[in-house]
């Protein structure tokens, strides 16, 4: 937050407790994405009837829906991939794990702050747009899980945009669908 607040182009400010988070710093990426730095959060406590016997689970798996394990990554559309990538590196300590360059223009970058292949990706928005979300990815497990989900989506007439298949970048398993609000969701897994 100190690095971002010193950067006048980041346009950030502090916010108090919102949505179960403590004090957080909201700022704009170089492309206009609204981002929050959060480091305190209320941890979910399941009611007694939903508590899992498996201690590493926040609650029992649901009997309906898809029991994803965690949010895996965000993919942001950007007019300037390099500027967004460098902001994540300079201010948040991310490192670039993979990138795609067309001629001398960076059109994709995958970044991580830990051992994951990526937590944030940014891709060139060929429409000229600014600050858009491409998708939110949830970690679902392995290739068979995505095949099972695809069969369920077909049975219930939920349109599949792409997959199941394997990404060339990251080598992760993927399945893309749109949720009812129109947001693109990726179910992401390991090979």
Which ranges hold each PLM region?
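Core segments of cupin and vicinal oxygen chelate
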Residues: 76-117
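Vicinal oxygen chelate
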Residues: 1-67, 70-79, 109-110, 157-191, ...
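Short helix/strand-bridging catalytic loops that position acidic/His residues to coordinate divalent metals
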Residues: 124-126, 134-137, 164-167
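Short glycine/serine/proline-enriched coil/turn segments at secondary-structure junctions
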Residues: 103, 128-130, 169
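A structural feature that tracks compact, well-ordered secondary-structure segments
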Residues: 38, 87-89, 110-112, 120-125, ...
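N-terminal beta-strand motif that seeds the catalytic metal site of vicinal oxygen chelate
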Residues: 49-82, 95, 131-138
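Short helix-capping and hinge/turn segments at secondary-structure transitions, especially at repeat
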Residues: 89-97, 116, 138-145, 155-159
């Amino acid at each position: 937050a100190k690095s971002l607040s010193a950067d006048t182009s980041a346009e950030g400010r502090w916010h108090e407790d919102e949505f179960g988070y403590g004090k957080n710093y909201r700022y704009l990426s170089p492309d206009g994405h609204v981002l929050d730095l959060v480091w305190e959060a209320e941890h979910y406590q399941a009611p007694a009837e939903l508590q899992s016997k498996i201690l590493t689970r926040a609650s029992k798996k649901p009997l309906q829906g898809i029991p994803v394990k965690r949010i895996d990554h965000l993919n942001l559309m950007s007019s300037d991939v390099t500027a967004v990538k460098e902001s994540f590196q300079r201010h948040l300590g991310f490192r670039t794990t993979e990138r795609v360059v067309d001629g001398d223009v960076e059109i994709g970058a995958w970044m991580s702050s830990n051992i994951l292949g990526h937590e944030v990706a940014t891709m060139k928005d060929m429409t000229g747009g600014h600050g858009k979300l491409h998708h939110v990815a949830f970690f679902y497990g392995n290739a068979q899980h995505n095949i099972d989900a695809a069969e369920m989506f077909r049975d219930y007439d939920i349109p599949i945009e792409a997959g199941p298949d394997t990404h060339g970048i990251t080598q992760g398993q993927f399945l893309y669908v749109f949720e009812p609000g129109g947001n693109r969701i990726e179910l992401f897994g390991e090979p």
